[in-house]
Amino acid sequence: MNRGKTLRAWLAVVIGSLGCQAHTRIAPRPLIERAEQLVVVTTPGWTSTTGSLQLFERATPDSPWRSLDLPVPVVVGRTGIAWGVGFDGVSSEGPHKHEGDGKAPAGVFPLDTGFGFAPRDSMRAVRLPYVQLLPTTDCVDDTASAHYNTVVDRSSVSRVDWTSAEHMRQVGQYEVGVIVGYNAKPAKGRGSCIFLHIWAGPQSHTAGCTAFDEAKLRYLMAWLDPEKRPLLVQLTANDYATLRVRWKLP
């Protein structure tokens, strides 16, 4: 198997095993109960394009959460956030995410794959599985493609069946980042290619990702430990307060 095919096969396994069930309601509490690292993002409301991020960790699943630092600013989708697939029944309030809506997904999602321009050898501080972005690395957002919501090396596929994709190596804000395990068993049209990545500044916004300062992102990538089952918890501030006890959030 050549390098491109190996990359594609590995990515398919990783992204397909992130735990998000298409067409199935996700039970966030068991995920949170097992986790020892949380990246918590809250926004003032559903249409807010800015918010805050704070890191929490604990020694064991039975230990109390402790904050690692003070909140830092983030930007989200150009039209705010919306309930991601698997979380449609959590609340009667709030929109539901769809492809191209410019909204970042709300819910609880695994964080277990890093990416960047640099080769793996120069990213040794990153403990997550890591993908070096090549000129041929695409994230497919074409809902008609068999590769929808998948990061692939287009040079390794027998037939490129998509007409729309992010050419990731061409995006400067993807110099470093983390794949969010959203819509991993893809529900067509419910959103794709969701990442944590470098922002263009505090007044910017994204197409549906969560972005922030590069130095903080590099710190986060070195902090994330796959053995601690890290999660992204992304909610409006009101929903975080409402769900805090039920989901056993910090």
Regions found by a protein language model. Name each.
Residues 1-11:
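Bacterial N-terminal signal peptides that target proteins for export
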Residues 11-22:
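Hydrophobic h-region of N-terminal signal peptides that target proteins for export
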Residues 23-207, 216-250:
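Cell wall/extracellular polymer interaction/catalysis modules
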Residues 210:
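Residues that recognize and position ribonucleotide moieties
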Residues 213:
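Conserved "landmark" site that anchors the functional core of diverse proteins
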